[in-house]
Amino acid sequence: EFIIEPRLSIRKKLGQYFQIEALGEFKHQNTSQIVNFQNDFLGIEKRRWQLSNDSNIPVIQSRQMSLGLSYSKSGWLISAEGYYKKIKGITTQSQGFQNQYEFVRTSGFNEVRGLDFIVRKRLNNFNSWLSYSFMNSDYTFSDLPEATFPSNYNIRHAITLGTNYTTGKLKVSAGLNWNSGRPTTTPVEGNEISNGEINYNSTNSSTLKDYLRVDVSALYNFRLSTATSANLGVSVWNLLNRENTINSFYRINNDAVTEVKQQSLGITPNLIFRVNF
């Protein structure tokens, strides 16, 4: 099959401090990732790549366009970008469903609309930034009872706040990451089991709790000799030790539906020492 993949990139300065950018591209992929889950309370993923064929695994086709405007002056960078993406040829096997569509095999497309916004400021030894992302991501599988519904990765809002301070040989950083919860599918309350199977609500009609994580780190550079330098660093992941649920699914156990939650790491210190010859 003959495939054309055009690209478009236009940048234009607007005065001294503004710039507008328009991007567009077509892409294709001849392999698709198949995700299978161990059918128990562990829910362990088994991933493999499979070549596209003429039957149940089509060639993935991506169409994407974006338009952005940025402002840069006196250490300030302010940027906003809107984008649209449509991906045809995705399969249910590749999306990691753990609900009523876990064992369904069909193909469809994914539409994503979003906006990214960032503000960054450099001031003396400080470099600080704030970013916000909005996204609306939907699946369409025409062979499913619900043709269109939110995608498994439809994280509607995300905020990142960070700063670092550098003085001499020492660099100290801190960051905050927050996002609204991932979509999830819950059983029908009061009628959780029907015909021996879990009776689910509409696909991805609920969300997990919001995700919040604070990290800090410090890195010190020094010399061991004229020809050898070293880096000594310490970092703490999830400083507040917050319990963040990153996935939730359901299984039948002793004729009752049980929820299985997967949590991210709690407070996790790390220490590094690197020698450069």
Residue ranges and their predicted role:
Residues L8-K12, I57, L67-Y71, L115-K121, ...:
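Residues on the lipid-exposed face of transmembrane beta-strands in outer-membrane beta-barrel proteins
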Residues A22-F26, L69-Y71, A80-Y84, L130-F134, ...:
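Transmembrane beta-barrel strands of outer-membrane/channel proteins
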Residues F2-P6, G24-H28, Q61-M65, K73, ...:
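Transmembrane beta-barrel architecture of outer-membrane proteins
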Residues Y17, G75, N125, K169, ...:
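Short loop/turn motifs that connect adjacent beta-strands in outer-membrane beta-barrel proteins
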Residues Q16-M65, G82-E102, G175-G196, R242-N247:
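Surface-exposed extracellular loop regions of Gram-negative outer-membrane beta-barrel proteins
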Residues K88, W178-S194, L212-R213, A218-F277:
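C-terminal beta-signal and adjacent terminal beta-strands/loops
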Residues Y84-K86, R105-V188:
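Gram-negative outer-membrane beta-barrel transporters
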Residues D54, P58, Q64, L77-S131, ...:
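Outer membrane beta-barrel strand-and-loop segments of large Gram-negative receptors
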